[in-house]
């Protein structure tokens, strides 16, 4: 793991907030693994809404303001996120090639090389918000 060893990784509990482990350039990468999933990012205003289609970053729209898609994850460059964006929500949805729901699927979000969020207790869900990266008195990560 770049930047840390397995022993350095801290687990997040559902609902827990932590300072975002930004790299030297102010970026953070979130990866979602454990099943064949489509990862997306929604750039949300304080009202919890996207401003336009550009605020939805996924495989068919791989670059948005301050956010770049990569298979199984996204990278958020906090310096490029517009001031009116309060939260970047990282989502995962089943891609149709595997199970029909997340019930029994071992799904986890890895934030940078320091934080890990095992998404447990899922049952009939086909899409989930895994983590949110928010700018509230400094960039924070919340396990949803």
Residue ranges and their predicted role:
Residues 1-144:
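Intrinsic-disorder/low-complexity signal
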């Amino acid at each position: 793991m770049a930047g840390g060893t397995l022993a350095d990784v801290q687990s997040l509990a559902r609902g827990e907030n932590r300072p975002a482990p930004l790299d030297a350039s102010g970026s953070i990468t979130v990866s979602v693994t454990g099943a064949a999933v489509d990862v997306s990012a929604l750039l949300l205003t304080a009202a919890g809404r996207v401003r336009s289609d550009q605020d939805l970053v996924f495989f068919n729209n791989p670059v948005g303001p301050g956010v770049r898609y990569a298979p199984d994850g996204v990278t958020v460059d906090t310096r490029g996120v517009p001031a009116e964006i309060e939260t970047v929500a990282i989502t995962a949805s089943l891609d149709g090639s595997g199970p029909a729901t997340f019930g029994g699927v071992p799904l986890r979000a890895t934030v940078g090389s320091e934080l890990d969020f095992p998404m447990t207790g899922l049952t009939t869900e086909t899409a989930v918000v895994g983590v949110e990266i928010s700018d509230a008195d400094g960039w924070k990560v919340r396990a949803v």
